[in-house]
């Protein structure tokens, strides 16, 4: 099995460079003469790669950007979104666990509304409506906390009523 030598493999890469390597002129070494790797890198400098840049969280943080034109047709108008061009790459919390807990264990009518808004958060994020997702997330959290508060009040009222009933009964 014949394997090509290293020089034969490098030859197509070094054809366009005008660099003389130290192996070609062993006695002569000029200050600043580039090595083969540097010459290859310099030959690629003029080429432009057509692939788009990969998205990154930190890409372009210091570079000014024109403001993004967002769809302002969201039905959630009470959002406190500031309209900045740098959007958070993180999904707003949907508070689904709180909504399920408040629906099953606390005050179910408000818990159902919190559950619906928690689902709306994920749908708005999937559509790219970050403003609507944030507003739905805040509403789901507030309704979940309200349902837990109303549930605690309901349970406390039930315990007080039960204690009053048992205290008013005559012992057997």
Swiss-Prot record:
Residues 119-139 are cytoplasmic. The chain crosses the membrane at residues 98-118, 140-160. Pfam families: CD225. Its main location: membrane. Keywords: Membrane, Transmembrane, Transmembrane helix. It is found in: Membrane. The keyword Membrane applies. Residues 69-81 have a biased composition (Acidic residues). Residues 1-97, 161-172 are extracellular. It is a multi-pass membrane protein. One of its GO terms (cellular component) is intracellular membrane-bounded organelle. Disulfide bonds: none annotated. Residues 1-31, 55-83 are annotated as: Disordered. Belongs to the CD225/Dispanin family. PANTHER family: TRANSMEMBRANE PROTEIN 91 (PTHR14768:SF2), UPF0338 PROTEIN (PTHR14768). This is Transmembrane protein 91. It comes from Homo sapiens (Human). The lineage of its organism: Eukaryota, Metazoa, Chordata, Craniata, Vertebrata.
